[in-house]
């Protein structure tokens, strides 16, 4: 029962609108938060401390076992590659030498400036008190913005599970965020709660209350707060939205008739990259096939009630340190770095089968400087525990109607090699049960895997151009409809005869 998924009784987690909300002060752009240093009383409880310590140890062992299995699996997969000796194809647009001296840092601003852009750190507060990091892409060439097809129209982009806004800025000029900004759009990158070490109005990050959330909270609070923030900052009544995996799952849940369907009146376009609505065959494989048998009491004993397997973030930090020390031992450092980056890639990558076949090798280390981001144990239980998304196979009951008339125009971008989520069942569901959904575009790229819609070397040709083309056609059509309606209303005010054709 979803009502019993809450870790503690302070949140009902059965969202019926009766629980207390925190009201933001004055504006969504609140003062810069100060991370809480005060440890809550519960940490002074030895029983809680011991249980959490044991959970960290057990979950770390589980993670290392998964990584080892993943490395063995990948090593076997390398044998055919070595036999074929097939090199990475050269692309006419790629200037490899330009990026040789690039640093490996965890700074969105650094990667933006290296491509002729900048990024502003901004933040928003949700109604339940969480501070969210927002990144606004600044295009230094204002004339280019005016000339581009976007003409200053705002787009909000939201990341997937374990990821952050950094996923959309590490592919140089061909990053989704920078490419759209170069086309004239105002680009805002959202981040879910807990990403970039953001805090809460009342709860310390050490407190279990801080981590008592799942995707339903993201749909009720985080996404609406981000959408309203972008609308407020840009002055537009409606904005475009692009979400990858959990990012679009959050939007599908928010727009459903059980949550906040009125959010659809604020969106002019919804682009879903790897739509996470129907589960793929990978969810029936190890380790997800075992995780989905765990009930909540067992889950919290294994993984705790704070963030999910914190060792993942530690491994990311260690891999970074190996790239910044030991310069005299260059060859040893390079070998160790590759091994650690492989491990860092393998823990979420093997779990969700994020293969790197279509990526540029030089980009992989910086891609994973921003991955993984902290995720609550309760959020992972929603995805992979007992009676979870993995068990059900879909976000909602497939034979029901999910969306009301406010649902925004939708474009779907799937991957032919994506085994984590499936796009075609969603298309069939929309055609059978969703008369209120206007499906603008369905594109399933045969070679694409789960993250290739923005990380693949050819993502611009596979996906980005299609997004802009679809949005432009839809926007022009809406503008023409508004013009016709406006002319009809103006004519009817002063004439009794019909509007001439």
Residue ranges and their predicted role:
Residues 8-88, 232-237, 246-394:
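Alpha/beta-hydrolase-fold enzymes
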Residues 71-125, 135-138:
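An N-terminal hydrophobic leader/cap segment in hydrolases
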Residues 126, 131-205:
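Short, surface-exposed "cap/lid" segments of acyl-processing enzymes
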Residues 159-160, 239-248, 415:
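Conserved alpha/beta-hydrolase "nucleophile elbow" surrounding the catalytic nucleophile
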Residues 209-232:
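Alpha/beta-hydrolase active-site loop
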Residues 406, 411-414, 418:
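Short beta-strand/loop motif that positions the catalytic acidic residue
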Residues 419-425:
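Conserved alpha/beta-hydrolase "acid-adjacent" motif
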Residues 447-461:
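Catalytic histidine-centered segment of alpha/beta-hydrolase-like enzymes
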